Amino acid sequence: GHGQDDFVRILAGVAHAYKGFTQVSINHGNDYFSIKSLEEAQKHEIAFVSGDRKREGILPNLSIKENLAISMYGNHSKVPGVRFIEWNAINDIVDWEVERLAIKTGPIENLITSLSGGNQQKVMLGRAFATHPKILVLLDPARGIDLQTKRDLYKQLRDFADAGYSVIYMSSELEEFIGFCSRVIVFRN
């Protein structure tokens, strides 16, 4: 590769740069922040979705609902400093993401491994959306999913971008950029 996977992982805070640093410009270049960890990326409302859902996405021993909700861990606690999952507060968000992303789940308490690969990937996208990110970083998210699920994915990402948020999408498939991206960066050498 040419470093594009590493770049995306560093930007999302899931990997560390061996040297140098990563800065994200905001407010039309008038301000910036650095990313040194996943916690810093999350603090700045950056979410990450990998195309390798088996290694970097699904938690196979958890239910569909738990896989969607895990990103909200602590975000809905009514007691400051207490980090636990409040299912009453989270159920509505989980139901909304399942409906919005048209995830074909069956009973939501089933293990996530009961879903097709495309629906597992939709759960990963829903998990990211549930954190209300301003920047969504995706690393080859359409890898190994069917054509209709790809179309659904692209529509959700376009809607997210049209709402004023940023999508950073890494792919090695040129066709994925046509009609989808406003800017393309090519990594070479």
Spans of features found by a protein language model:
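H-loop/switch region of ABC-family ATPase nucleotide-binding domains
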Residues: 171-172
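Hydrophobic anchor residue at the start of the ABC signature
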Residues: 125
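ABC-family nucleotide-binding domains
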Residues: 139, 146
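A short, surface-exposed alpha-helical micro-motif characterized by mixed small hydrophobic
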Residues: 177-179
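Conserved P-loop NTPase catalytic core
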Residues: 8-115
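A short, proline-enriched helix->beta-strand linker immediately N-terminal to the Walker B motif
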Residues: 130-134
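Helical segment within the ABC ATPase nucleotide-binding domain
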Residues: 151-163
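Short, glycine/charged-rich "phosphate-handling" switch motifs in NTP-dependent
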Residues: 183
